[in-house]
């Protein structure tokens, strides 16, 4: 067995194992769409240092509402309502809006948090990255509803007869 046979054997073995002799790998193709709804994704080729990603942005806004404020305004004179409003504790209600965009992201940006402004509103971004062709097709799932997640185990415990032990 000569040197040329050994070289051909190594070349065949590296091809079988999926190793390539050229440094150029194919670039990823990712779906791309902006924050606008509905998202109609369009495939696009990324740059060498980019991966596919889904960026999910949340905008938390706190609204302060005074309990019984409508009742006070309708039944009491305006002056009395204005002076009595401080007697009631305000309630806070979080109103969160979620936006999403897909596209190519620099690999180094994946673990980092980001910020974006969309329609004059500020959003905190989290990135979910993947490294296969068109792997960012699926929509991200919204966070679970906290009251629902609390009630479901309680209902299951009652249904299974655990209420006897409580």
UniProtKB/Swiss-Prot annotation:
Residues 1-18 form the signal peptide. GO terms for molecular function: acetylcholine receptor activator activity; acetylcholine receptor binding; transmembrane receptor protein serine/threonine kinase activity. Pfam families: Activin_recp. The keyword Lyase does not apply. Residues 28-151 form the UPAR/Ly6 domain. One of its GO terms (cellular component) is synapse. It is found in: Cell surface; Cell membrane; Cell projection. Disulfide bonds join 30-52, 33-39, 110-129, 130-135. LY6G6E is a pseudogene in humans. Interacts with CHRNA4. Believed to act as a modulator of nicotinic acetylcholine receptors (nAChRs) activity. In vitro potentiates alpha-3:beta-4-containing nAChRs maximum response by increasing peak current and slowing down receptor desensitization; the activity is dependent on its cell surface localization. This is Lymphocyte antigen 6G6e. It comes from Mus musculus (Mouse).
């Amino acid at each position: 067995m000569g040197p040329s046979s050994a070289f051909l054997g190594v070349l065949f073995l590296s091809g079988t194992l999926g190793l390539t002799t050229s440094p150029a790998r194919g670039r990823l193709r990712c779906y791309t769409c902006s924050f606008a709804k509905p998202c109609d994704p369009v495939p696009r080729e990324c740059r060498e240092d980019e991966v596919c990603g889904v960026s999910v942005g949340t905008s938390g806004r706190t609204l302060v509402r005074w309990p019984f404020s409508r009742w006070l305004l309708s039944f009491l004179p305006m002056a009395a309502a204005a002076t009595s409003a401080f007697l009631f504790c305000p309630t806070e209600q979080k109103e969160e809006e979620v936006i999403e965009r897909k596209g190519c992201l620099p690999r180094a940006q994946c673990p980092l948090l980001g910020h974006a402004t969309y329609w004059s509103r500020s959003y905190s971004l989290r990135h979910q990255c993947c490294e296969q062709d068109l792997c960012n097709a699926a929509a991200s799932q919204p966070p679970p509803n906290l009251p629902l997640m609390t009630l479901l185990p309680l209902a299951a415990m009652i249904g299974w007869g655990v209420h006897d032990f409580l």
